[in-house]
Swiss-Prot record:
Subcellular location: Secreted
Main location: secreted
GO cellular-component term (any): extracellular region
InterPro entries per UniProt: Bi-component_toxin_staph, Leukocidin/Hemolysin_toxin, Leukocidin/porin_MspA_sf
Keyword Cytoplasm tagged: no
Source organism: Staphylococcus aureus (strain MRSA252)
Protein name according to UniProt: Gamma-hemolysin component A
Signal sequence region: 1-29
Length: 309
């Protein structure tokens, strides 16, 4: 049962001022309270911020678990939004006969904290996932019991649950690093189906073709041979669960990073054939990092900074 306590929380003037920038958009946050039984509540906050410069949007849901039967504060952070692919086609300025495709080999998603009183206790997804569609559930039972189910349809009855669901066709999700203070995922190009069969994401000739015209775009395969993560971008859906020692500090800061690593494929015609060159991670860590401050007592969430501005 959701109580009718929907409030509009506006960022303080002193917070907005340092972030004022034509390349950044911050939306208002919507707040809700959900009764999950036995006197426990989930206090929900949402923050949206967009970097127009890097074409990245973070939509972050902060669910505070208020449970008298759990001896710690708990926070479930669901990371959503959009990371544009920024795939481009162009001629090299000094050598216009060489055509270039810049495309995302990897999407980056991470959360970390430096707070000694905060620990990462769960996260989704876990391990390596190579399925095109990813669906998992995090569940909570009164008393501090967090569990994860393999899919949205997984068995188990929870007082509260949160799901993730996203498409990663031709890509694979890997946990690159994880410890008590954070987790980092990489959603990496894996393999692609081409007219010549299955091709590795590391293949030198991937996406290049005999030109169908003089433009840079004509040197690379058409859109119907490219997956959504290259044509348009990636919609992340990841979860972290964090615990906080009660009575040890009212506020904590978290840094959430979204971004991409870009590969470059070069193509040009020699006298006898199409020549192709490839540079892996040509543009690495094209990321946006947003620092959020959460208040464990008032359950407020504020945006402290964004890098780059």
């Amino acid at each position: 049962m959701i109580k009718n306590k929907i409030l509009t929380a506006t960022l303080a003037v002193g917070l907005i001022a340092p972030l004022a920038n034509p390349f950044i958009e911050i939306s208002k946050a919507e707040n809700k309270i959900e009764d999950i039984g036995q006197g426990a509540e989930i206090i929900k906050r949402t923050q949206d911020i967009t970097s127009k410069r890097l074409a990245i949007t973070q939509n972050i849901q902060f669910d505070f678990v208020k449970d008298k039967k759990y001896n710690k504060d708990a926070l479930v952070v669901k990371m959503q939004g959009f990371i544009s692919s920024r795939t481009t086609y162009s001629d090299l300025k000094k050598y216009p006969y060489i055509k270039r495709m810049i495309w995302p080999f990897q999407y980056n998603i991470s959360l970390k904290t430096k707070d000694s009183n905060v620990d990462l206790i769960n996260y989704l997804p876990k391990n390596k996932i190579d399925s095109a569609d990813v669906s998992q559930k995090l569940g909570y039972n009164i008393g501090g019991n967090f569990q994860s189910a393999p899919s949205i349809g997984g068995s188990g009855s929870f007082n509260y649950s949160k799901t993730i669901s996203y498409n990663q066709k031709n890509y694979v999700t890997e946990v690159e690093s994880q410890n008590s203070k954070g987790v980092k995922w990489g959603v990496k190009a894996n393999s692609f189906v081409t007219p010549n069969g299955q091709v590795s994401a590391y293949d030198q000739y991937l996406f290049a073709q005999d030109p169908t015209g003089p433009a840079a775009r004509d040197y690379f395969v058409p859109d119907n041979q490219l997956p959504p993560l290259i044509q348009s971008g990636f919609n992340p859906s990841f979860i972290t669960t964090l615990s906080h020692e009660k009575g040890k500090g009212d506020k904590s800061e978290f840094e959430i990073t979204y971004g991409r690593n870009m590969d470059t494929t070069y193509a040009y015609v020699t006298r006898h054939r199409l020549a192709v060159d490839r540079k892996h991670d040509a543009f690495k860590n094209r990321n946006v990092t947003v620092k959020y401050e959460v208040n464990w007592k008032t359950h407020e969430v504020k945006i402290k900074s964004i890098t780059p501005k």
